[in-house]
Amino acid sequence: MPTVSMRDMLQAGVHFGHQTRYWNPKMGQYIFGARNKIHIINLEHTVPAFNDALAVIKQMASQKKKVLFVGTKRAAQKTVKEQAERAGMPYVSNRWLGGMLTNYKTIRGSIRSYRDLETQSQDGTFEKLTKKEALMRTRTMDKLELSIGGIKDMGGLPDAMFVIDVEHERIAIQEANKLGIPVIGVVDTNSDPAGVDYVIPGNDDAIRAIKLYVTAMADACLEGAREGSPAAAADEFVEVESEEKVANNG
């Protein structure tokens, strides 16, 4: 089971919150104190909260459920895209389009258009078009790639959503709440934890901290997927069978 230690978190700067004047009183229970007018997050809360969230994600992945990774702020974009792709999970790393979940039917239409253009670009259709028409279609495809490329294989609504910076992704969280999709979120000292089912109190700005969260989540997805695979189930069956033989022979 992938877990993250307090030492890992300290090295990544997870404990550094925002300036004290920007704090949200709802995060008071997670604050250890202040240093140089910066709130310090109590990692005694963060470590178990994060490891509990990893266990939930691992369990979901073992049941072939989809976890949507969301991080559209500049510091998170690259890591969210890379790690979600590594884990084989959907992601939104550029911009959250209003209605991405609550108006999924329309989004599905855009995904179909994107897939069609992708096919055309690969099967030689673009080469038969005028330069201008081919350029226009390429531009449309690139735009769609940016906005929905990460969810093209989601195949329906996700089973959970993992969010970096809940304040920045408030619309995404509201949509998930409306649909009863559980939200796991990294919540800094300036943010409102409302609407987040699994609160991970921590720094949501430092690239090292973001890498730590997102990489561990991707690892949990991969480990869960391995355990839920037919090969893993077969290994388990063989083990049980051999135990039964020993018992019968004894």
Swiss-Prot record:
GO terms for biological process: translation. InterPro entries: Ribosomal_uS2 (IPR001865), Ribosomal_uS2_bac/mit/plastid (IPR005706), Ribosomal_uS2_CS (IPR018130), Ribosomal_uS2_flav_dom_sf (IPR023591). GO terms for molecular function: structural constituent of ribosome. GO terms for cellular component: cytosolic small ribosomal subunit. Keywords: Ribonucleoprotein, Ribosomal protein. The keyword Ribosomal protein applies. NCBIfam families: rpsB_bact. Belongs to the universal ribosomal protein uS2 family. This is Small ribosomal subunit protein uS2. The lineage of its organism: Bacteria, Pseudomonadati, Pseudomonadota, Gammaproteobacteria, Cellvibrionales. The gene is rpsB.
